[in-house]
């Protein structure tokens, strides 16, 4: 099982959501410590080691460091726009 980091990022995002949606996202995030690269994950172009998984209408962006067996959740955001990618770019630049 991988270590899971960045849960405070997830919890902050979940506060404003409906409980059912928040639970779906939380379940998806927690599953990453068991399977850091699930079949539905996609590696982000231009960001080595960064991946995304979708949970309903939301994107979960995380970094997987296999040498440390660490999953770090970086961002969670809506899928209907590219704001989450812009936030990632600002965060890493």
Identify the function of each model-found stretch.
Residues 27-53:
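A short, surface-exposed loop/turn module that caps and links secondary-structure elements
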Residues 1, 55, 63-93:
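Enriched for short, Lys/Arg-rich terminal
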Residues 1-28:
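Arg/Lys-rich, positively charged N-terminal/basic patches that mediate binding to nucleic acids
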Residues 9, 49, 78:
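Residues that form or immediately flank small-molecule/cofactor binding pockets and catalytic motifs
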Residues 58:
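ATP phosphate-binding glycine-rich loop
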Residues 11, 50-52, 61:
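Short aromatic/hydrophobic contact patches that present stacked aromatics
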Residues 12, 31, 81:
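Active-site micro-motifs of SAM-dependent methyltransferase domains
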Residues 18-22, 34, 38, 78:
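Alpha-helix boundary/capping and short turn/kink residues
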């Amino acid at each position: 099982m991988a270590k899971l980091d960045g849960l405070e990022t997830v919890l902050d995002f979940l506060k404003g959501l409906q409980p059912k949606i928040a639970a779906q996202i939380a379940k998806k995030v927690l599953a990453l410590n068991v399977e850091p690269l699930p079949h539905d994950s996609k590696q982000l172009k231009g960001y080595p080691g960064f991946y995304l998984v979708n949970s309903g209408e939301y994107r979960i962006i995380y970094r997987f460091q296999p040498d440390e067996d660490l999953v770090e959740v970086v961002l969670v955001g809506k899928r209907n726009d590219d704001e989450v990618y812009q936030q990632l770019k600002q965060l890493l630049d």
